Amino acid sequence: MKLAVDFAIKKMMTKKTSAIHFSSRSNEWATPQSLFDRLDDEFKFTLDPCATEYNAKCEKFYTLAQDGLDQDWSGEIVFMNPPYGREISGWMKKAYQESIRGVTVVCLVPSRTDTRWWHNYAMPGEIR
C-alpha cells in the first residue's frame, strides 16, 4: 500500500490554509489540486472512493451514498483522502485489505502514530 501522510501537504500550504486544514469543525478535507496532480502524475489514479460530487479527483468516484467501503476496488489505482474522524480506521482497514489483493492505494491521512489504525494498516505500507 502506498501512503502519503499530511506532512507532504504542510510543505505546500500557507499559514492561512494550514489553519483551515487543521480545524476541528469538519472531518473532511479537500485535497489541494497541486498535490493531487503531482501524485496523479506518478500513479495515474482511476478511483476516488471518498469523494463528494463537488470534490472528486477521479472520473470514477464513490460518494457517501455509494459507500466506498462496500465497493470492490479491484483493478483500480486508488487515491483515498478519507474523512479524518473516527471512521478513518475503517477506511484504512479497507485500503490495507485492498492492497493485499494487489490494488495500489495511495492514502492521504494525518500521521496519527499513536493509533491502532496507524500501526495495523499504515506501518506495513510505504510512508512518504
Describe the residue ranges of each PLM region:
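Class I S-adenosyl-L-methionine-dependent methyltransferase catalytic core
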Residues: 2-128
